[in-house]
Amino acid sequence: MTEEEKINGESNYSASNIQVLEGLEAVRKRPAMYIGDISSKGLHHLVYEVVDNSIDEALAGYCDHIEVTINEDNSITVQDNGRGIPVDFHEKEQKSALEVVMTVLHAGGKFDKGSYKVSGGLHGVGVSCVNALSTHMTTQVFRNGKIYQQEYECGHPLYSVKEVGTTAITGTRQQFWPDATIFTETVYSYDILATRMRELAYLNAGIKITLTDLRVKEEDGSCKQEVFYSVEGLKEFVRYIDSSREHLVNDVIYINTEKQGTPVEVAIMYNTSYNENIHSYVNNINTIEGGAHLAGFRRALTRTLKKYAEDNKMLEKAKVEISGDDFREGLTAVISIKVAEPQFEGQTKTKLGNNEVMGAVDQAVGEALSYYLEEHPKEAKMIVDKVILAAQARVAARKARESVQRKSPMSGGGMPGKLADCSSKDPEECELFLVEGDSAGGSAKQGRNRTFQAILPLRGKILNVEKAMWHKAFESDEVNNIIQALGIRFGVDGEDSKEANIDKLRYKKVIIMTDADVDGSHIDTLIMTLFFRYFPQVIQQGYLYIATPPLYLCTKGKVKEYCWTDQQRQKFIDTYGGGSENAVHTQRYKGLGEMNPEQLWETTMNPENRMLKQVHLENAAEADYTFSMLMGEDVGPRRDFIEKNATYANIDA
């Protein structure tokens, strides 16, 4: 952007660019409609909405630094160095443009095509929605050499926009206090915010995002802080995701172009693993269900690699038919496109429906990949050899899988012999417990409610699928038992033989129930890795849970209490034992098998009393990195992670 364009942009961005669509009243009544939910996810979404405004300024070329601060009182401050929200008079609304942006839903420059070419925000509800769901919010605008301010309570302004000082900077500063009467969770997680800020920095090269947590003091007295900044954008992003994997080819194949009016940025890397990891974004939103841009990418990749291999007579020795997903084994890619008016659809509104984008991505990837392969014959041969290996493994996998899928999952035929099924056939109410060990499985079978609770005992640690070739999973009895019991099928949706289909899922609650020790946690992680790599839809749709059996049974006379944490146990000792451990009898449960069926039901299985942890997929790219780091071949990153997090671990020593 030239200096002249920048000056014109600054002078043209005014009240007339602010369009208004609808009122705010509905937001407090039905918050989940606007921000997804009212738990931790929705709470963090408030921050993303405010940051999205600053990112829009950055994409338009007016901002290069965004500061996000978690304050000591758990309020959030977001400040950017953009142009500042317009404060002049809005003719239609008869008030300051700033007040319109802050108090009217869907009011903002992002709905006026002249102000922003593209704009982020999945729900795109804007900062007014954040205002409505905050007990208090303060906005300061640095513009025209002056500081303007307005404060609000639950979305209502406390006074008109006023000047409160002079300044040499430009930008906007927002501080808000989420409403505890609306949100079930009001404590911000630094890690969740850091993950999203890191992602935004990779997706928008050249923008500096500073995240500070004033609640946490470091050893030197300073506050916890990270600066996220990327020079190479997606190139660095794909290297970060793949940092715990062995690279097949050291190059990142990078594409940054515009086709058919759509900006397309793609980074591709091949590794020696057996998983396909493609992360796609539209206007900075992670489209976890894919869509037109992902279809265009896959089509181009398959066509271009296949043509190169055939032209160079590399497939003749393969003796197997090569399919689309063979080309994607061991592939890590990030696709980021910008669309002026994205149409989102699918289960979680994260699937791109704009079909015109498919051709643009197809053309961009096809041209760039073709050029790369011609210029790098050695690397191209390594990629094609890997494809042939994948095809041979796929044929072996199909044979193994067909033996699993021969019987219908709904008929009860073909169910694992160890499965103690429930009598109900309604997936909405049915629960499947994946239980560690036969002895605990026996207690669970006796203690359960047979109407809606099914039990599948697992023998020891299941296969670590992160290190195994695709078809090896289907040769594992324990993995097969889980797939059969759930009613999951593969390759029924067309071109991708590895795509899981959960339309006939037999249970809408899948609960991992293991011992409360290190081995139990390891088994939890192995099972979660299987779900994430083979049927992530179960996690995405919120069906996977982890049971939390109690650690202790504390007794004093006739008073008995189960304790899930050391803090609860200490509270019992303080209350009933006068602070003396010796005055209280404590039974430590090392394993589920130590509980009788009634105790297991009462503490861990009864929906009235139990505590379940729902497994969330907050950020697919970060989860991809974490699973490959924890469960993959490379020991170094795993050791670093353990050393960094050892203080939080529950270790039986």
Where are the model-predicted features located?
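GHKL-family ATPase ATP-binding module
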Residues: 2-17, 24, 48, 56-58, ...
